[in-house]
Amino acid sequence: HAFEDQLGYVEIFKQLGVGVVQMCYNTQNLVGTGCYERDGGLSGFGREIVGEMNRVGIMCDLSHVGSKTSEEVILESKKPVCYSHCLPSGLKEHPRNKSDAELKFIADHGGFVGVTMFAPFLAKGIDSTIDDYAEAIEYTMNIVGEDAIGIGTDFTQGHGQDFFEYLTHDK
């Protein structure tokens, strides 16, 4: 995690212009659990990080975070949080995609959902088209409403399969 084990780094990142931070990237860190592991939830240090991010004005991004950790961040945060780039698991089951319940929960708590166009996570995988992306937007909007949805591109092109396999591992 960018903050390592230093709560003071949060304010430094804000001073450097950072406005949104991933709480986890696919795997466990000192804050909580990513989407590719058994989810142990938000840690005590994670609660401190959420509080400090709220204080300085950095938004918590839960795109790569596990379900339990996400729920606990949403409940802990005094400010809106986001899934800046995700897709609904109702159209394709994948650890990075979010369930209907997760999408509704974040929207019900004032959060935001950015629908990504990352083809491997769309309904038809790498064979997906713009129509599949439009379907994902409509599906998500029917759950969260038009005020809690946007475009969360996470656009990656020009890379081979090895790069995408690398993306599923811890950074």
Language-model segments: residues:
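Short acidic/histidine-rich active-site segments
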Residues: V144-Y166
